[in-house]
Amino acid sequence: MYDLLKTIDDPADLRRLDRRQLQPLADELRAFVLDSVSQTGGHLSSNLGTVELTIALHYVFDTPRDRIVWDVGHQTYPHKILTGRRDQMSTLRQLGGISGFPKRDESPYDTFGTAHSSTSISAALGMAIGSKLRGDDRFAIAVIGDGAMTAGMAFEAMNNAGVEDDVPLLVILNDNDMSISPPVGALNRHLARLMSGRFYAAARAGVERVLRHAPPVLDLARKLEEHAKGMIVPATLFEEFGFNYIGPIDGHDLDSLIPTLQNIKELRGPQFLHVVTKKGQGYKLAEADPVLYHGPGKFNPAEGIKPSTTPAKKTYTQVFGEWLCDAAELDSRVVGITPAMREGSGMVEFEKRFPDRYYDVGIAEQHAVTFAGGLATEGMKPVVAIYSTFLQRGYDQLIHDVALQNLPVVFAIDRAGLVGADGATHAGAYDLAFMRCIPNMTIMAASDENECRQMLYTALQQPNPTAVRYPRGAGTGVATVKQMAALPLGKGEVRRQSTQPAGKRIAILAFGTMVAPSLAAAEQLDATVANMRFVKPIDAALVRELAETHDAVVTVEEGCVMGGAGSACVEAMMESGVIRPVLQLGLPDRFIDHGDPAKLLASCGLDAAGIAKSIRERFVEHASGKSVKRVA
């Protein structure tokens, strides 16, 4: 099994194969991807769709000397397998294992780290120009999906690249949202070879040189060429950016891909190759439902993904989706917005029930935020459902277009804190720090499912921009209450009171997901625990009260310590003039790698045992009979 694949330890081995061996290799590679992902979990549909394209790129180009930048990067499993990581696939996305995305420190073939979309063309252009300035003759190739092409950054890069006449740049559009019928496919195969050939490029350049002295004739010739191409292929847009458009061609046909790429390799100037692929290619279940098989957990490939038979705790994403539908039922002004994350953000049911108030704006976070601001000016109640890591991309719009004008936009921030297998690129570590410094913002962190529901309702009542953050995955098992009531603004609650005498009293101020482990740690330490609820406005009165009545204060948050919720507590103490020793616990000042979420939290000292251990190490353990060390 995998006889050919076992002989490939790097692309040099691949390039030694006879062309006739490549399709059997592709079949083995596709089977290996399916087998691997079924055992580890991970992205499947997208990787099954890039097998032939990956083989063709490494076969034609001299990688890693020639650079390949994979946009988003979740489709790079075939690339990883062919570049020396075949035997490490069993560790995929696990603690200490290989990443599910390209990482520069993992392999020289991972030339640029990706995970957020639409960055590849900018990076590849920088590489291509850098290569040209150094006098190196190497290609830079950006592989970008049709979804990622909706983002403005991709077009900004193309606009920049189009004026570089001799830059060795190739942009490959991996279009998996359309299909080509066999007759059109045959025609386009011939056309792609023609358009990528040196004769076509030379003839085109020669005609332009001759006609440059007759601008009206040159303009007419260009229009005729665009019209001729436009009748067969959607070339005009990319040609307008200054690219030579080639395609579309079948991205699963090595007999089309390889000759076309070989022709392109002889050209200079920005080239644009349009390939058509199918998500889930070669695995019927994934072809039929690529969304279900986008990022599955472990499953049996012979049976496919089966619904769980054990009752599962409701996820925070489900809580949000149910709340949004309930809110829209009660108020016709509620509008739901997602930047291309309908399923991930829990908005499938909302789209079905309220299609006129559902807006998927594509991978366009900046637009999503400002679009919501515009809706708010017209009396609507926009709710932007967005992952914490992706809100970073709309930060200027959050400040300039929403907060500065004090517009009532609700931000439902999913995937706050650590996200597990997706790793550092998707971690929601920074939202508390980057939002709490913005005037007019209200920020809440949910500690359980019902509190999340009530916070979302509270946010909808506010006259200013308001954010509710909640984590990925299942909640604590708390039932949600159908009736919704607004929480007192800027007020926390004490969940546990210490019975320790003066001199040994410790107060833990916990935020969001850290309330539960803080309560568990407090049982070991007999500490007071407050569920702070609001990061902004911070409950300054509660902070002062707890500081006055306790000998030390501990803040705990699932976010970066610097500038986060703990900093807000320290600022409140300083302002009140009540100074106590403070221990701030949160995510450390480093990027947290991929792995099991519980293990990652434990490694950061943010599980119950870690919180208790940190408190004991920072302050004198109660069992010693001594008082808390007054270390400022």
UniProtKB/Swiss-Prot annotation:
Binds 1 Mg(2+) ion per subunit. The gene is dxs. It holds the Pfam family Transket_pyr. Pathway: Metabolic intermediate biosynthesis; 1-deoxy-D-xylulose 5-phosphate biosynthesis; 1-deoxy-D-xylulose 5-phosphate from D-glyceraldehyde 3-phosphate and pyruvate: step 1/1. It catalyses: D-glyceraldehyde 3-phosphate + pyruvate + H(+) = 1-deoxy-D-xylulose 5-phosphate + CO2. Its cofactor is Mg(2+); thiamine diphosphate. GO terms for molecular function: 1-deoxy-D-xylulose-5-phosphate synthase activity; magnesium ion binding; thiamine pyrophosphate binding. InterPro entries: Dxylulose-5-P_synthase (IPR005477), THDP-binding (IPR029061), Transketo_C/PFOR_II (IPR009014), Transketolase-like_Pyr-bd (IPR005475), Transketolase_BS (IPR020826), Transketolase_C (IPR033248), Transketolase_CS (IPR049557). Thiamine diphosphate binds at H74, A115, H116, S117, G147, A148, N176, Y283, E365. GO terms for cellular component: cytosol. It comes from Paraburkholderia phymatum (strain DSM 17167 / CIP 108236 / LMG 21445 / STM815) (Burkholderia phymatum). One of its GO terms (biological process) is terpenoid biosynthetic process. Homodimer. Keywords: Isoprene biosynthesis, Magnesium, Metal-binding, Thiamine biosynthesis, Thiamine pyrophosphate, Transferase. This is 1-deoxy-D-xylulose-5-phosphate synthase. Mg(2+) binds at D146, N176.
